Amino acid sequence: MKDYLRTQIRRVLDALGDVPDDFEIELEAPDRPEHGDLATNTALRLASVLGDNPRSIAETLAERLRERVDPARIKSVEVAGPGFVNFRFAQDYLFDGLADLLAQGDTFGQTDAGAGERALVEYVSANPTGPLNVGHGRNAVLGDTIANLLAWTGYDVTREYYYNDAGRQMRVLAQSVRARYEALAGNVPTTTLTLDDDTTVEVPETFPEDGYLGQYIVEIAQALYDEHGDALCATDDLAPFRAAAETAIFGDIEATLRALNIDMDGYANEQALHDEGRVDAVLDGLADAGYTYEEDGALWFKTTEFGTEDDTVLVKQTGEPTYRTPDIAYHTAKFERGFDLMVDVFGADHHAAYPDVLSALDVLGYDTDRVDVILYQFVTLVRGDEPVKMSTRRANYVTLDDLIEQVGADVTRFFFLMRSPDTHLNFDLELAEEESEKNPVFYLQYAHARICSVLDKAEEVGFSHDEDADLALLTHEDEIALIKELLRFPRELQNAADARAPHFVPNYLRDVATAFSQFYDNCRIIGEEQELASARMRLALAAKTVLKNGLTVLGISAPRQM
């Protein structure tokens, strides 16, 4: 409807003249239902351009729109306040929309806005140095839901996980496993480390500085010892220790993601970029363009020419690239694979790094308008208003597995999606553990299960939701309000996809559940005449469809019973 009205308003403005071609027409739902279904502030914004008072412009706009709009879609066009133009939908439009919703069923909400376009969404992208933590969980769920939204709006979506496997972190990981392995293989002196929280831990003397301390390291070392005995003590090669750690940890990571209903289409790694010559190609390309220089034994990128305070190191004095360099190479590979849209989901700690990557891509001739970087803020576990630290066995931090085990996958996903990515998230364990409608995800799932129960009971006593039911019988204000809410679904999904804002969807679904509750409280099904009962059952089925489809987009189950 917004697209239709924008077209009609644009045609009226073209006839008025003196309106800039790039003038954007704004249409929003009024805060109060009595002001109509949609409103535009066009007259207010054009007053200075047209040299007239906004109320007069609004009157002219409304008069001409009344002549243009389809009465089967728009019931009335009204002027309100200082110059707003309000629109009310015709009931035929609502009933036709409801019939379309019911006909589309499980595909309602899908659009072809991105048809013919290929999108790559990169998310999680945690290095395989340990179990996923709670922050990785927010990344995973945000990225996966953005991918779902893009798929629902027509894109051909690829979900990809990138990790650095050629740098210091992986070397320290291998050294950590080796030290634990050597301790299992013989008497190795130990030393005591004091951690940030003042707890202490005994480690072998050969344990590396900043080594990985979790129990999972001991488990990997034990598996190596069980397979090889002490044979690996004779080699200085870290490769078997790194390979064993990477395989074991990635197996755990993939299992964690599956528990959250996340399946990646592919994995990319830093070592492959080196092997393919992509990292060297990036350095050569930036040098040829005159954007690098050597100083103090390091290779620098002239990022100050793009507004940064300091230039950025691309290759350290040791000859080892900084992590930005393979990241640039990875993005060149994305472009060369032909993706029209590339979405990167990063933690807020990347806020200084990703502009350097985009600047390098600009220098290398790539269209960075096709890259969309989503930065998310971090997560704090709280109980009520108090921060909490959950105990954990396998790592010296709270793992994502710990959280899923405590509150469940559906709740975990939903809570990660309740707030805008750029907002710090307090994950309230007390609320998450609540198995009642106080819990926001349970509220939606209860609404879905309640509708299933209502429809089942109605059928048991002889009512049916006849496909030919007369939807025009749905004239109660709560019926009309629910229909309007349901028909917003495709637009809400499109807005969420366009803005890469998954939190739009749970907020909208809460409105649907509330509107259904209001309808059900005031519009009974069992006990009404068959024709009206059938129409109301069709409306209930439509509400069930929207709730289920919305939860599907969020990667959350829609149970028939609770």
From Swiss-Prot:
It catalyses: tRNA(Arg) + L-arginine + ATP = L-arginyl-tRNA(Arg) + AMP + diphosphate. Keywords: Aminoacyl-tRNA synthetase, ATP-binding, Cytoplasm, Ligase, Nucleotide-binding, Protein biosynthesis. A motif ('HIGH' region) lies at residues 126-136. GO terms for cellular component: cytoplasm. The keyword Glycoprotein does not apply. It is an enzyme of class 6 (ligase). It is found in: Cytoplasm. GO terms for biological process: arginyl-tRNA aminoacylation. One of its GO terms (molecular function) is ATP binding. The keyword Phosphoprotein does not apply. It comes from the Bacteria. InterPro entries: Arg-tRNA-ligase, Arg-tRNA-synth_N, Arg-tRNA-synth_N_sf, ArgRS_core, DALR_anticod-bd, Rossmann-like_a/b/a_fold, tRNAsynth_Ia_anticodon-bd. Belongs to the class-I aminoacyl-tRNA synthetase family. Monomer. This is Arginine--tRNA ligase. The lineage of its organism: Bacteria, Pseudomonadati, Rhodothermota, Rhodothermia, Rhodothermales. The gene is argS.
